[in-house]
Amino acid sequence: MDKNAHEADGIIVSCRIKPHNAFRGPYESGVCKMMVVGLGKQKGAESVHSDGLGNMARNLPANAKVVVENSNILFAIPCVENAYDETALIEAIPTEKIFEREPELLKIAFSNMPSILVKEADVLVVNEIGKNFSGTGVDPNISGTWSTEFGKGGLQVKRTCFLDLRDSSHGNANGMG
């Protein structure tokens, strides 16, 4: 864990809860991930990723429990967004309720995700990609363009075409290859 966080009188975990873009489980991108990767920095990220994405759904809450047991997490304040990236819900969660409440909030986040109205397409044309949309440039939860076998959902598409890169990505075209 980050030295400054570990030495703090208390830690309040603030984050978004949303579907992950590479795996599925009861804890994806949210409080547990913020405790393990956010507070754990590089070593936390290495620890939770060490067994590969196929074990992420198991490793993330297990590692988060170690963080809770060995630090002073006071509570968490996650938010859930709507389909327009606007805050739909903010909730304070006592530490002892994090592992119970986060999966429930993830279900709300899934139900709030935007979607493409058709389920299958031959070609998906994406106007803009960028790191601000997803680490892979486009959110596979919507586009179905998964870079891993451990994620699922979104459109079933045969070919995808990207027209432009968002300026705020500063040339980072991760997801193009």
Feature-to-residue mapping (PLM):
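Anaerobic metallocofactor- and corrinoid-dependent redox/one-carbon enzyme cores
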Residues: 1-177
